[in-house]
């Protein structure tokens, strides 16, 4: 009789111990949801987590990005060439017109993700043309990857035999996210599960089942999108779409108790753009100084004022540059401290 009881007690103690361990593990698991409109920089943040909190990119993984980088470079120059026609811009050198025609033809015939020498020579000649540069300066009037200038001005390096993409090359590469991508890593005794969700409108209906049990939402909005329209709808300003989306997320009943952090991203692109294009393009009521600080702060206020529960719910915001590893490292460190403070104080672990 006694032996049976003690075995039962032992089993009970073991079960209790396991339940306690499971509870601690759950308490240390952080579900992070990355949300934001298309091309705001969500996937770049995910790449940074791999660089900062995992082992970064192996040589093999870096080499896999070559095809993407070549594809991005070709898409960019083709977008500029097409815009030359729609914006009615003349080539600085009429010989470039033939180069442009040749390039269009080659783009349809080459193997995707490759960059033959003849093609890279044509692209480099086009990129140096004054008309192409004038068209590039008007990039907000058509759809162009943020990485266009980065890759096109460094194409000679990218096509050198034996080229291995650098971390920066990888960070600037762009593949549209479809579906949901999960990344797991540990930091400050926490186990993170980060979910990157496609930002284009057609992808958003896939978000809903990710919502349950989310610890923190990082909402990413591109500061530089204030003078741009959507890929999916050229009537809608990207900043307005981002504000609309943020409004629906931050005031959603699902997220009443969820920490929300706002990343105002692409501050590097914004700081250059604001020198040339006035914020009133997006916000006609804005009559403040058209400086990085004033305009940036005005955008931040537009987002934060959408929070209907300001008295009980604080939204933390950071200006970010997702391609800058040190900046992301610093900001994510601060975000983790917020998560610890907000969500884990109840479980007695911290």
From Swiss-Prot:
The gene is Gnat1. A lipid is attached at residue 2 (N-myristoyl glycine). Residues 1-21 are annotated as: Disordered. Keywords: Cell projection, GTP-binding, Lipoprotein, Magnesium, Membrane, Metal-binding, Myristate, Nucleotide-binding, Phosphoprotein, Sensory transduction, Transducer, Vision. Residues 7-21 have a biased composition (Basic and acidic residues). GTP binds at residues 36-43, 146, 171-177, 199, 265-268, 322. Residues 320-325 are annotated as: G5 motif. GO terms for molecular function: G-protein beta/gamma-subunit complex binding; GTP binding; GTPase activity; metal ion binding. One of its GO terms (biological process) is response to light intensity. Residues 28-350 form the G-alpha domain. Belongs to the G-alpha family. G(i/o/t/z) subfamily. GO terms for cellular component: apical plasma membrane; heterotrimeric G-protein complex; membrane; neuronal cell body; photoreceptor connecting cilium; photoreceptor inner segment; photoreceptor outer segment. The lineage of its organism: Eukaryota, Metazoa, Chordata, Craniata, Vertebrata. It holds the Pfam family G-alpha. It is found in: Cell projection, Cilium, Photoreceptor outer segment; Membrane; Photoreceptor inner segment. Residues 192-201 are annotated as: G3 motif. This is Guanine nucleotide-binding protein G(t) subunit alpha-1. Functions as a signal transducer for the rod photoreceptor RHO. Required for normal RHO-mediated light perception by the retina. Guanine nucleotide-binding proteins (G proteins) function as transducers downstream of G protein-coupled receptors (GPCRs), such as the photoreceptor RHO. The alpha chain contains the guanine nucleotide binding site and alternates between an active, GTP-bound state and an inactive, GDP-bound state. Activated RHO promotes GDP release and GTP binding. Signaling is mediated via downstream effector proteins, such as cGMP-phosphodiesterase. It comes from the Eukaryota. Residues 261-268 are annotated as: G4 motif. Residues 340-350 are annotated as: Interaction with RHO. Residues 31-44 are annotated as: G1 motif. The modification Phosphotyrosine is found at residue 142. Residues 169-177 are annotated as: G2 motif.
